[in-house]
Amino acid sequence: MVDEFTHLDNQGKARMVEINQKPDTSRRAVARGSIYMKANTLQKVKTNEMEKGDVLGVARVAAIMGTKRTGDLIPMCHPLMLTGIEVNFNFDEENCKIDIEVIVKTTGKTGVEMEALTGVSLAALTIYDMCKSIDKTMKIEHIRLAKKSGGQSGEIENE
């Protein structure tokens, strides 16, 4: 694992990393996060009773769109041809939260960690936006890379 910043040149200026010499490999990243809310808000989302509509359906589309646009949103990310995006939601009624998971796949020269993290972030933000009219206490927490595979660093588990 490299202990230096690859996005800085020898003068400390930001640059986009050259990846042309890297081999194409199968890449996969799993990101996770949670949004906490009041119990009645969670129930309305679960039963699809929110005034703005299907919260998780819209959040799923937002996650997919955000994942695909990561290269436009984060300055030093390469635009990637993604081969698969999966978005999963899990209701945790005991802790009044929705757990979000985004799995991204590609075959290419660079990883898809930022894409997975962006997907989780946008799903959580979309849920927040669609529920904020009835719940001003929501919290988005624990957005993290859970797993990745492929490339020079191989398999990484972060949970």
Swiss-Prot record:
InterPro entries linked: MoaC, MoaC_bact/euk, MoaC_sf, MoCo_biosynth_MoaA/MoaC, Mopterin_CF_biosynth-C_dom
CDD domains cross-referenced by the UniProt entry: MoaC_PE (cd01420)
Entry keyword Metal-binding: no
EC number: 4.6.1.17
Active site residues of this protein: D129
Pfam family, one: MoaC
Protein name: Cyclic pyranopterin monophosphate synthase
Family: Belongs to the MoaC family.
Species of the source: Natranaerobius thermophilus (strain ATCC BAA-1301 / DSM 18059 / JW/NM-WN-LF)
Subunit-level organization: Homohexamer; trimer of dimers.
Keyword NAD: no
GO molecular function: cyclic pyranopterin monophosphate synthase activity
